[in-house]
Amino acid sequence: MIITTWIMYIFARKTVGLPFPPRVNSDIEVEESEAVSVVQHWLNKTEEEASRSIREKMSINDSPTHGHDIHVTRDLVKHHLSKSDMLTDPSQEVLEERTRIQFIRWSHTRIFQVPSEVMDDVMQERIDQVRRSVSHLMCDSYNDPSFRTSCSEC
């Protein structure tokens, strides 16, 4: 009976000329200016600390250590958006792009110089760290009553 009802529903929609499944745009634009400014402040602070740290490490580690092969686990990505660029084009799109680039850059561009002998150990340690982090997030969201309520509505 359920299958027959669905078949009739689909047939009726196609007969009338409506698509199945219905095209519904469920994405709603939400702008949280306070959250954006907090993230932007955090990213600027992290950017300054990271650039200072990278400059120090690069000046200290100009040559390979003890003749070992050196592997860099992340490439250093350089983006040249400065505050003067923001003043010339203060649109929201540029601000969002800059925030996105900074977040990606500083969350993925830590430079770790590792001798080739310990490369596998370092990679396994990083994988375990990510798994623990994901597991922790899943446990936190499961224990959050508002998350369970929103999931039960799905």
Swiss-Prot record:
Alphabetical GO biological process terms: cell differentiation; sperm mitochondrion organization; spermatogenesis
Tissue specificity, per the record, is:
Expressed specifically in adult testis (at protein level).
Q: Where is the transit peptide?
A: 1-24
Its keywords, alphabetically, are: Cell projection, Cilium, Developmental protein, Differentiation, Flagellum, Membrane, Mitochondrion, Mitochondrion outer membrane, Phosphoprotein, Spermatogenesis, Transit peptide
Q: Which InterPro entries match?
A: SPATA19
Record-level GO cellular component terms: mitochondrial outer membrane; sperm flagellum; sperm midpiece
Q: Which residues carry this modification: Phosphoserine?
A: S26, S116
A Pfam short name: SPATA19
Question: Which residues span the membrane?
Answer: none
For the null mutant, the annotation states:
Male mice are infertile, their sperms exhibit disorganized mitochondrial structure and the sperm-abundance of mitochondrial proteins and activities of mitochondrial respiratory chain complex IV, and ATP levels are significantly reduced. Epididymal sperm possess seriously disrupted midpieces, leading to a severe reduction in sperm motility and infertility.
Location(s) in or outside the cell? Mitochondrion outer membrane; Mitochondrion; Cell projection, Cilium, Flagellum
Function, as annotated: Essential for sperm motility and male fertility. Plays an important role in sperm motility by regulating the organization and function of the mitochondria and is also required for correct sperm midpiece assembly.
Q: Which PANTHER family match?
A: SPERMATOGENESIS-ASSOCIATED PROTEIN 19, MITOCHONDRIAL
Task: Return the protein name.
Answer: Spermatogenesis-associated protein 19, mitochondrial
Source organism of this protein record = Mus musculus
